[in-house]
UniProtKB/Swiss-Prot annotation:
The modification N6-succinyllysine is found at K13, K121, K317. The record marks Y364 as: Necessary for preference for fructose 1,6-bisphosphate over fructose 1-phosphate. Pathway: Carbohydrate degradation; glycolysis; D-glyceraldehyde 3-phosphate and glycerone phosphate from D-glucose: step 4/4; Carbohydrate biosynthesis; gluconeogenesis; Carbohydrate metabolism; fructose metabolism. The gene is Aldob. Beta-D-fructose 1,6-bisphosphate binds at R43, S272, G273, G274, R304. This is Fructose-bisphosphate aldolase B. It is found in: Cytoplasm, Cytosol; Cytoplasm, Cytoskeleton, Microtubule organizing center, Centrosome, Centriolar satellite. GO terms for cellular component: centriolar satellite; cytosol. It comes from Mus musculus (Mouse).
Length: 364
């Protein structure tokens, strides 16, 4: 039976589907450069660089001004509001620099967490008020996709059914509003890696969360072909004493996705969740070699796992431009190969690439 009140026109659906497919075509993934001022400050502090708007702009200019060949591995970049309106040293808006490289521009749309009363420190996400107006303005300003991060954690009686349902509905409402305004919604339900839970526990919780999210997306008439999913990989908690291989992570992850994510979704772009750069690449490669049906493109949407080596190479010094850009390009290409199951670990990664990037209760 045809839906009596269609949410989108055929033209809107076509545009959304084409944008989503462009982002994940041929092993391409997403650079998440949407860190808030505070989060970026924590990163700069580690390399002893002051957290000023100019220093944030300079580092992002290094990432965005790399050789045009970056478009072979990066299909989209998520920006923070500040960055969307910043310019490079020649006076060109960053968003135009990216578009000229054939990269799709995205924006962070959620406004952080708010406590869910009556739960064990669980949260829901703020930002739905005024979202339609913000999306409309961002579309005019050249943005083609959005991102909304909901956070769930594994702990005593967590995640509760209330937290799962509340966050699933917020994600679905956001996705619907995005699509009405011509933006592809990246749906990000993150099960945090904090805790000592094992792989099986994370898989169980991830399946419950994803099932609720896709039920909510269906209830809200979201056009799945015009969305992307940004989930956590299924991993053991950071404090778990048992260690798992990339192949075990891959099997648990693809099994969870296979049970919950419709084949209509064009791409699944994993978050790195505080893994080292190298671990994030190895796990993604194993996922794309997993001997289970994989009807979606399985790619990456990494922040720390694409930037850590580059940030360490930069150190706040303009003279380190070449080394910074080479470090970023190397990680981007490695993840593009992993998104096609073709990455070969050479063992020649620098210290920054193998260092854990985990931060407890991580917030953007």
């Amino acid at each position: 039976m045809a839906h009596r009140f269609p949410a989108l026109t055929p033209e809107q659906k076509k545009e959304l589907s084409e944008i989503a497919q462009r982002i994940v075509a041929n092993g391409k993934g997403i650079l998440a450069a949407d860190e808030s001022v505070g989060t970026m400050g924590n990163r700069l502090q580690r390399i002893k660089v002051e957290n000023t708007e100019e220093n944030r702009r300079q580092f992002r200019e290094l990432l965005f001004s790399v050789d045009n060949s970056i478009s072979q591995s990066i299909g989209g970049v998520i920006l923070f509001h500040e960055t969307l309106y910043q310019k490079d040293s020649q006076g060109n808006l960053f968003r135009n620099v990216l578009k000229e490289k054939g990269i799709v521009v995205g924006i962070k749309l959620d406004q952080g967490g708010a406590p869910l009363a009556g739960t064990n420190k669980e949260t829901t996400i703020q930002g739905l008020d005024g979202l339609s107006e913000r999306c409309a303005q961002y579309k005019k300003d050249g943005v083609d996709f959005g991102k909304w991060r909901a956070v769930l954690r594994i702990a005593d009686q967590c995640p509760s059914s209330l937290a799962i349902q509340e966050n699933a509905n917020a994600l679905a409402r956001y996705a619907s509003i995005c699509q009405q305004n011509g933006l592809v919604p990246i749906v990000e339900p993150e099960v945090l890696p904090d805790g000592d839970h094992d792989l099986e526990h994370c898989q169980y919780v991830s399946e419950k969360v994803l099932a609720a999210v896709y039920k909510a997306l269906n209830d809200h008439h979201v056009y799945l072909e015009g969305t992307l999913l940004k989930p956590n990989m299924v991993t053991a908690g950071h404090a778990c004493t048992k260690k798992y291989t990339p192949e075990q992570v891959a099997m648990a992850t693809v099994t969870a996705l296979h049970r919950t994510v419709p084949a209509a979704v064009p791409g699944i772009c994993f978050l790195s969740g505080g893994m080292s750069e190298e671990d994030a690449t190895l796990n993604l490669n194993a996922i794309n070699r997993c001997p289970l049906p994989r009807p979606w493109k399985l790619s990456f949407s990494y922040g720390r796992a694409l930037q850590a080596s580059a940030l360490a190479a930069w150190g706040g010094k303009a003279a380190n431009k070449k080394a910074t850009q080479e470090a970023f390009m190397k990680r981007a290409m490695a993840n593009c190969q992993a998104a096609q199951g073709q990455y070969v670990h050479t063992g020649s990664s620098g210290a920054a690439a193998t260092q854990s990037l985990f931060t407890a209760s991580y917030t953007y």
